[in-house]
Regions:
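Extracellular/periplasmic head regions of type IV pilus-like filament subunits
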Residues: 115, 184-279, 283-286, 290, ...
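Short beta-strand edge/turn micro-motifs at domain boundaries
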Residues: 119-163, 167-170, 295-299
Length: 326
């Protein structure tokens, strides 16, 4: 059964590396270069925002506030518009995250200068980059550039969502194979929908009942679909920033050529899935497709992603799609 818990993104912890090897490392390695290329986001601190005489002073103030859980001090350091950036609103999680950051800072910390003169704080033995850089204002004082930090957080969240959805694509494939091993309506077949009809097991998800097999996927993924929006709008939410669809045909560029996965009203000749960002450029950039062969392809479909991807029905990785290497 495929299901995960969605965790609020926090600036105090590094994004988790998932099981896609070098691809994960490449994405994480892009974090600092992204900062360097974009350059400074603003030139002056917000009114009332704390400034510092040196990066070292800023680092000391930051870790002291983290150790003490001093939210007011943190808000003063990052500016009046930083509430939703530095804190999640979950008191227990914020406390744990701050403590984890303080521990990492205590193990190792140093500042790295970026090309445009800003400084980024690296903490812990893995040199995790704190997402909000330090910048000099016109008077020579240092301040945390929260605007640039927001951009960096968006980039990191996109990277984490994309890594997570590479995993989801693989797990959806496994879910269909698992579904196929069970008899449905007297024959083996792949599911053509995510959510089963009431009292049936004709989709990849059905409510759990004592003494009956569990569905191959959980409700979070099942309702992160256009089908889920129709069934129960209150449960329709993106999973790790993405929505999903089932592909019922493969095109000329797929292995084996053009083929309808359905024969005589039953889908037993293959299957495919598409995973696309709920908000292009905010929750994700790449759209992913996979079929029964287990190879994931990706494509940047641009600003029209959310208009086109929900209507995709064909697995057809032509030259505009790139194979994702593990």
């Amino acid at each position: 059964m495929v299901s995960k818990t969605i965790r609020h993104f926090t600036i105090w912890q590094p994004a988790p590396v998932r099981s896609w090897g070098a691809w994960a490392l490449v994405l994480l390695a892009l974090v600092l270069p992204a900062c360097r290329k974009k350059g400074p986001a603003g030139s002056e601190p917000a009114r009332g925002q704390t400034t510092f005489t040196s990066p070292e002073d800023a680092g000391k103030a930051l870790v002291d506030a983290a150790k003490n859980g001093n939210q007011q001090q943190l808000l003063a350091m990052f500016g009046p518009d930083s509430q939703g950036v530095i804190l999640t609103g979950n008191a227990a999680q914020d406390k744990a995250s701050l403590a984890q950051f303080a521990e990492a800072f205590g193990r190792m910390n140093r500042w790295r200068q970026l090309e445009h003169g800003s400084q980024v704080l690296l903490v812990g033995v893995s040199n995790t980059a704190f997402p909000i850089p330090l910048k000099k204002d016109s008077s020579g004082e240092w301040f945390f550039d929260t605007k640039a930090g927001k951009n960096e957080l968006t980039n990191r969240e996109i990277g984490r969502n994309e890594l997570a959805n590479l995993d989801v694509c693989g797990m959806l494939r496994i879910a269909e194979l698992e579904y196929f091993e069970q008899s449905h309506d007297g024959e083996k077949q792949y599911a053509t929908k995510f959510i089963s009809d009431p009292g049936k097991q004709n989709g990849l998800y059905w409510p759990e009942e004592p003494g009956k097999p569990k569905s191959p996927i959980g409700p979070q993924i099942a309702y992160a679909t256009t089908e889920g929006a129709r069934r129960q709008a209150s449960l329709h939410k993106p999973f790790y920033g993405y929505y999903y669809g089932i592909l019922t045909i493969q095109g000329y560029y797929a292995s084996g050529g053009l083929r309808d996965y359905t024969r005589n009203g039953v889908m037993n000749r293959g299957f495919g899935f598409v995973a696309y960002p709920a908000k292009y450029g905010i929750t994700g950039v790449m759209t992913f497709i996979i079929n029964q062969d287990g190879i994931v392809f990706q494509k940047d479909m641009g600003a029209t992603t959310t208009e086109e991807a929900p209507f995709m029905r064909q697995f057809n990785p032509d030259g505009s799609w790139l194979e994702v290497k593990e």
